[in-house]
Curated annotation (Swiss-Prot):
The keyword Mitochondrion applies. Residues 1-30 form a transit peptide. Keywords: Mitochondrion, Transit peptide. This is Altered inheritance of mitochondria protein 18, mitochondrial. It comes from Candida glabrata (strain ATCC 2001 / BCRC 20586 / JCM 3761 / NBRC 0622 / NRRL Y-65 / CBS 138).
Length: 309
């Protein structure tokens, strides 16, 4: 008891509690709770966890942080372990596993966490169409982009300057907006680490779109797109952990939704949003700005994009 009190005092007064220590503590507490017979108390705890994960999907309620996971590494070059609670993300996705229009290669992956308890909500992967990779260089190598936003340091290579620009909150907005305007195709893959709610998953996507800095300038147009999102995501009820929710940004700017039920091994094609601002704003929130959905995912994507110029 005394040792515990002393340790708490040291942590409080000297700031020795590192983020890694807090992460370990939370993880151990969650993993130590073995399955027990259902009781009113345990049911309330379960629903509290589901609600917390759903709140993270909704976005904006909590400040989200990223911890670069030691677990995150390639397995035989075919998949990336984002978190040990979910199936590793394949580095290449295509048919027949998912109902996609073409073959996609991973740009980056990471975790969305709730900073209040450093609580992991879901794993996120961003993919780029293999056929569209040359568009990255076409956009970032243009004279206009190079002269005005990218190649500011003559002592650095073009690729290094691209990475610096993509790390800048303001410049990254400009670079990614221009990239998305090139009709580039991408996929966002969301995999819950804990059981989540379909309703709040949908609300989270909508909120991320609405948080784009240009959303207020296009309220009427965006409102029509938001209505399409509500109609397109047809799943209801819980979204079990380790299921996959995919959003494919097509060349015409439309956004196609699909859902993979891992337990049943069934893929459901959902609806499509045709208003291009929805897909553009959503992927811009993943890849740019000062408060991206998952900072770690954004950073990895920036590194990969810089390597393509």
């Amino acid at each position: 008891m005394l040792r515990t009190l002393v340790r708490r005092s040291l942590i409080k007064n000297t700031g020795l509690a590192t983020r890694a220590t807090r992460l370990s503590a939370v993880t151990k507490r969650l993993q130590s709770s073995a399955p027990k017979p259902a009781t009113e108390k345990s049911d309330k705890k379960a629903w509290w966890i589901v609600g917390l994960v759903s709140a993270a999907f909704a976005g904006g309620t909590y400040v989200c942080t990223w911890e670069r996971e030691e677990l995150q590494k390639e397995r035989d070059g075919k998949s990336v372990l984002v978190d040990d609670a979910v199936t590793p993300f394949p580095v290449v996705i295509s048919r027949p596993t998912y109902p996609l229009s073409t073959k996609y290669d991973i740009l980056g992956s990471g975790i969305r966490s709730v900073s209040v308890l450093t609580f992991k909500a879901y794993a996120l992967g961003i993919y780029i169409a293999r056929q569209d990779k040359p568009k990255v260089a076409q956009v970032f190598d243009s004279t206009f982009m190079s002269k005005n936003f990218i190649d500011m340091d003559e002592n650095k290579s073009h690729a290094e300057n691209v990475k610096i620009a993509l790390d800048d909150p303001e410049k990254s907005r400009i670079l990614i907006d221009n990239l998305l305007d090139s009709n580039i195709r991408m996929v966002a893959k969301l995999t819950p680490i804990k059981n989540a709610s379909a309703k709040l998953l949908k609300e989270g996507i909508i909120k991320n779109v609405q948080m784009h800095p240009d959303a207020s300038k296009n309220k009427e147009t965006l409102a029509m797109g938001i209505k399409e999102v509500e109609e397109a995501i047809k799943i209801k009820g819980p979204v079990p952990k380790d299921d996959d929710f995919l959003m494919e940004l097509l060349a015409d700017g439309s956004l196609k939704f699909s859902y993979y039920n891992r337990r049943k091994d069934i893929v459901n094609e959902l609806g499509t949003v045709h208003q291009p601002l929805v897909g553009k704003y959503l992927f811009a929130q993943y890849l740019s700005g000062s408060n991206p959905v998952s900072p770690g995912t954004k950073d990895q994507c920036a590194e990969t994009l810089a390597s393509l110029v």
